Amino acid sequence: MNKILILLLLVSAVLTSHDQVVAVTIKPNLYNINSAPLYFEKFISQYNKQYSSEDEKKYRYNIFRHNIESINAKNSRNDSAVYKINRFADMTKNEVVNRHTGLASGDIGANFCETIVVDGPGQRQRPANFDWRNYNKVTSVKDQGMCGACWAFAGLGALESQYAIKYDRLIDLAEQQLVDCDFVDMGCDGGLIHTAYEQIMHIGGVEQEYDYPYKAVRLPCAVKPHKFAVGVRNCYRYVLLSEERLEDLLRHVGPIAIAVDAVDLTDYYGGVISFCENNGLNHAVLLVGYGIENNVPYWTIKNSWGSDYGENGYVRIRRGVNSCGMINELASSAQIA
């Protein structure tokens, strides 16, 4: 009986208003810096890392050691998130951003998408928790790999959800088609969500993943119009000024592709990130829900770094404080044809 009570105390959970189980965040023990060489060898084995020379291995080890010191510092502060070693642990933050994000910088540019200003107070009566996953309207987490195509993954993630909302069926759309055939955006070198929607309108539609598989590299366009699964009728770019109104928009429209600064997301493991700075937008992700855990309000975001990242591929960031610079004018969604 005592063992059962101890187990129940260690493995606790809370329920949201939609009966979704959310694990309570438990802070881990800090990494012993003196054991960094052992951690590094385990990391190499776990993630099948291969280095071209001993010099490169030493260089990567130094980055790894610096990163676990940073992880310890984050886990020591009064934050509601947990950070751990993951596959990015031998990379600098700039390397992760350069290789695994892909939101284009610079001017927004003119396109056909309608611009909508999202401002003002939210609806008085709105649920404290909401998540499109509870309604089976969000497809599985994907991995963009070392290709700066986050814009394609976030944009098509929103389209996949629109399809599920309309037809009550989940399908995976072809990010590779956008990487290869969207000639306004720059494939693995970056792009914007709303211009991707414009290009889908121009091309005529987008194929499913199994008809145009993802390769994580830009290849000659091989689009097959007779295989189009979804078209875009209208697209929208949102100028976000109010997080309360964004809650309403999310519930009424569906999952929305948003832009964030991903630097503070790289070593995330679980919980709610309370400290996420904005030093420049660089990553596109899919906003799927919001809620409250331990009195901390949060947004739930679907990332494109694989299901072994974060909370099964998802990350939660604090709501109401412009976490990661998410309140900007690059959020987008589309109406399917």
From Swiss-Prot:
Translocase is among the record's keywords: no
EC number: 3.4.22.50
Keyword Cytoplasm applies: no
Enzyme class: hydrolase
Covalent S-S links between cysteines: 147-188, 181-221, 276-324
Active site: 150, 283, 303
Pfam families: Inhibitor_I29, Peptidase_C1
GO molecular function: cysteine-type peptidase activity
InterPro entries linked: Papain-like_cys_pep_sf, Pept_asp_AS, Pept_cys_AS, Pept_his_AS, Peptidase_C1A, Peptidase_C1A_C, Peptidase_C1A_papain-like, Prot_inhib_I29
Entries under Gene3D superfamilies matching the protein: Cysteine proteinases
Alphabetically ordered keywords of this record: Disulfide bond, Hydrolase, Protease, Signal, Thiol protease, Zymogen
PROSITE patterns: THIOL_PROTEASE_ASN (PS00640), THIOL_PROTEASE_CYS (PS00139), THIOL_PROTEASE_HIS (PS00639)
Catalysed transformations (reactions): Endopeptidase of broad specificity, hydrolyzing substrates of both cathepsin L and cathepsin B
The record's account of how the chain is modified after translation: Synthesized as an inactive proenzyme and activated by proteolytic removal of the inhibitory propeptide.
Propeptide residue span(s): 17-126
GO biological process, any: proteolysis
Record's signal peptide: 1-16
Function: Cysteine protease that plays an essential role in host liquefaction to facilitate horizontal transmission of the virus. May participate in the degradation of foreign protein expressed by the baculovirus system.
Family designation: Belongs to the peptidase C1 family.
Protein name: Viral cathepsin
Organism: Mamestra configurata nucleopolyhedrovirus
